[in-house]
């Protein structure tokens, strides 16, 4: 449907019986009304043509071939001069065959049937509105219980006997046995109600506004009572209050949407268009039918049997009528939601029938796969892997994906630079992967963000913008810190990439959706780009250092035997002196030359303007030199002082891993400061 703002939308809800008739009703030129499916047949086994008034009837659903009726006559579609519009012999309309994708039919049920979604799904809407236990309502729907009609003003047989007193009582084996079909109908119409018809009567008698008022009064009374001191009673009161809130919300919804509650009980059953439940031929000419066709056939068979019992057979016991009504109810339940009442129905090969609910729900259902999961132009999909060298706002796109996504822009660039004279030549250069193509692609990607999305998109961080760069391979590279926002793992997860085309979309991506601008969780406000998993392990390994401490290198009489044993057991062991470095650059150079390891302790000269060490710590050792200068050695640093006790320089005890980690943090802070000063 289309709203007043010309937006296409889909609304799912209950419809009136008149609306169901309007979906499938057609009036032929001779005045005959078609649309009702009365026969459970599909195609004739000899002619291979649809059966009249069957599930694939061409009079109801339209012609199989455009403009050709069941007789074989042909009319030009849309030609106003062609008359008549319907075939006079077979009654088939001369229209396009695509009408069989949306032209519906209907089945007129011989008895009311409850919609299993509203009865059996939790919470049960029918049970909530009627304020009755679900178990009792199920017994009433499936003809296990009956209740007296509180509408007769004069005394009746049951009211004089006091058998019911308007309460649901079991009369399954006591009432129908004494009546034939005609007598049972008269008795039931006057005295009792059972089956879905009883539910329909109760729903039709409801006043939704009175339900809201009474529920609100009861909810307030329960709230004023306070705690009873009994845990079970308090829990029972809380459950009752929650039920009253759900009941009021449900009643308000029915009022707001202008839907009558009795629509939850069906008198007419819509029949899906034939193209949505096809019968196809596989290899060898064997037909393959949709499960929904078999479920529809079961409904029609049982409904026709019940119709015969009510119209033709006057001597049939009332018990048989009730049993047949129960079979019709179960057949409709299986069609709508197979297995909701327990064991699902299976075919001859022990395969579960796929009901209407199975067709539309789930990941492979009609909505998620066909409507919500449509393929989108300028989009791609691939596995994600870690790109630790990437910036937070960048992502790596494989060349194969990038050239497809930006092919239109590359073609325009080739033509503008007069490298190609037309689109065909430009596409041939792209297929041949000439070097100029990659240069133009780099230029195009430099100013064009892309959107990355991982399903399911549960919050706004499920889709973020990135600046793409070309990478080798066939996987999308991501910075590990953006993983948590997407709720993704690098174990085979896939992500979709989209190219924003309009200027508005690109501006929104740059201003609102870039990953480095979404560092906090929109729900809690906590940081969401934090190191996790292998990043924490890497940081631990990088900064673990040598845990023996500075005293481990000291030689004294206590550990003399230890050094001797180590020398004997390991011929490669040498007691190396901890090296001194004047800058971090020299230390990293020594590591690259493999002169030191990542966790080897070393002394790094520290600039005085970077840190002022003021500590009351007592030095572990003081070493004097011949010129009068001396070294004060502490646990993690060393101070070189002059004769006048002035600080000449400071060395800190660290490792190459700590130096690398510090340099990364320092560069990140400096980059943030530059960006902040540029923004202000």
UniProtKB/Swiss-Prot annotation:
Cofactor binding summary note: Binds 1 Mg(2+) ion per subunit. Binds 1 Zn(2+) ion per subunit.
Keyword Protein transport set for record: no
BP GO terms, sorted: DNA-templated transcription
Record's catalysed reaction(s): RNA(n) + a ribonucleoside 5'-triphosphate = RNA(n+1) + diphosphate
Residues at which Mg(2+) binds: 489, 491, 493
GO cellular component, one term: mitochondrion
Disulfide bonds: none
Annotated keywords: Chloroplast, DNA-directed RNA polymerase, Magnesium, Metal-binding, Nucleotidyltransferase, Plastid, Transcription, Transferase, Zinc
Membrane-spanning intervals of the chain: none
UniProt-listed PANTHER family: DNA-DIRECTED RNA POLYMERASE, DNA-DIRECTED RNA POLYMERASE SUBUNIT BETA
Described function: DNA-dependent RNA polymerase catalyzes the transcription of DNA into RNA using the four ribonucleoside triphosphates as substrates.
Protein name: DNA-directed RNA polymerase subunit beta'
């Amino acid at each position: 449907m289309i709203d007043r703002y010309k937006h296409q939308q889909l609304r799912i809800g209950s419809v009136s019986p008149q609306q169901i008739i309007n979906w499938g009703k057609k009036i032929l030129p001779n005045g005959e009304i078609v649309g009702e499916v009365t026969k459970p047949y599909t195609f004739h086994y000899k002619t291979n043509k649809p059966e009249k008034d069957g599930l694939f009837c061409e009079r109801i659903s339209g012609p199989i071939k455009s403009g050709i009726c069941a007789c074989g006559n042909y009319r030009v579609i849309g030609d106003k001069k062609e008359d008549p519009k319907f075939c006079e012999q077979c009654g088939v309309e001369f229209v396009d065959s695509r009408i069989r994708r949306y032209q519906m039919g209907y089945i007129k049920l011989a008895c009311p049937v409850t919609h299993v979604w509203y009865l059996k799904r939790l919470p049960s809407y029918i049970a909530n509105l009627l304020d009755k236990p679900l178990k009792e309502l199920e017994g009433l729907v499936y003809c296990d219980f009956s209740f007296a009609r509180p509408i007769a003003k004069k005394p009746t047989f049951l009211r004089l006997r006091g058998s019911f007193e308007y309460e649901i009582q079991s009369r399954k084996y006591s009432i129908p046995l004494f009546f034939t079909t005609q007598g049972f109908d008269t008795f039931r119409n006057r005295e009792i109600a059972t089956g879905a018809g009883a539910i329909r009567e109760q729903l039709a008698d409801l006043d939704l506004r009175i339900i809201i008022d009474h529920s609100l009064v009861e909810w307030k009374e329960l709230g004023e009572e306070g705690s009873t001191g009994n845990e079970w009673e308090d829990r029972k009161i809380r459950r009752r209050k929650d039920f009253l809130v759900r009941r009021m919300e449900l009643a308000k919804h029915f009022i707001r949407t202008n839907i009558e509650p009795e629509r939850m009980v069906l008198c007419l059953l819509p029949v899906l268009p034939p193209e949505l439940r096809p019968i196809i031929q596989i290899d060898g000419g064997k037909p393959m039918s949709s499960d929904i066709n078999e479920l529809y056939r079961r409904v029609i068979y049982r409904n026709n049997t019940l119709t015969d019992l009510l119209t033709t057979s006057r001597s049939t016991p009332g018990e048989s009528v009730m049993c047949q009504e129960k079979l019709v109810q179960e057949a409709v339940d299986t069609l709508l939601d197979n297995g909701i009442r327990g064991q699902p129905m299976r075919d001859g090969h022990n395969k579960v029938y796929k009901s209407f609910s199975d067709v539309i729900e789930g990941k492979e259902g009609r909505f998620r796969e066909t409507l919500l999961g449509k393929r989108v132009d300028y989009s791609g999909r691939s596995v994600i892997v870690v790109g630790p060298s990437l910036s937070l706002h960048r992502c790596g796109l494989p060349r194969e994906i990038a050239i497809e996504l930006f092919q239109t822009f590359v073609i325009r660039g080739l033509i503008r630079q007069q490298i190609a004279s037309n689109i065909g030549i430009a596409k041939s250069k792209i297929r041949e992967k000439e070097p100029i193509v990659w240069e133009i692609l780099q230029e195009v990607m430099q100013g064009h963000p892309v959107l990355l999305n991982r399903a399911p998109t549960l919050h706004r961080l499920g889709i973020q913008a990135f600046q793409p760069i070309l990478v080798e391979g066939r996987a999308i590279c991501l910075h590990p810190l953006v993983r948590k926002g997407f709720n993704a793992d690098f174990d085979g997860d896939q992500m979709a990439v989209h190219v924003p085309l309009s200027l508005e979309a690109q501006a929104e991506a740059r201003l609102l959706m870039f990953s480095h601008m979404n560092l906090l969780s929109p729900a809690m406000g906590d940081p969401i780009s934090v190191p996790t998993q292998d990043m924490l392990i890497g940081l631990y390994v990088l900064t673990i250092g040598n845990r023996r401490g500075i005293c481990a290198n000291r030689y004294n009489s206590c550990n003399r035997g230890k050094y001797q044993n180590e020398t004997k057991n390991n011929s490669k062991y040498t007691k190396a002196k901890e090296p001194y470095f004047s800058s971090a650059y020299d230390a990293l150079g020594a590591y690259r030359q493999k002169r030191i390891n990542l966790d080897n302790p070393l002394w790094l000269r520290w600039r005085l303007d970077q840190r002022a060490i003021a500590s009351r710590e007592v030095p572990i050792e003081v070493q004097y030199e011949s010129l009068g200068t001396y070294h004060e050695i502490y646990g993690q640093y060393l101070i070189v002082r002059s004769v006048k006790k002035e600080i000449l320089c400071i060395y800190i005890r660290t490792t190459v891993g700590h130096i690398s980690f510090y340099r990364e943090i320092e560069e990140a802070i400096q980059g943030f400061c530059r960006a902040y000063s540029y923004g202000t």
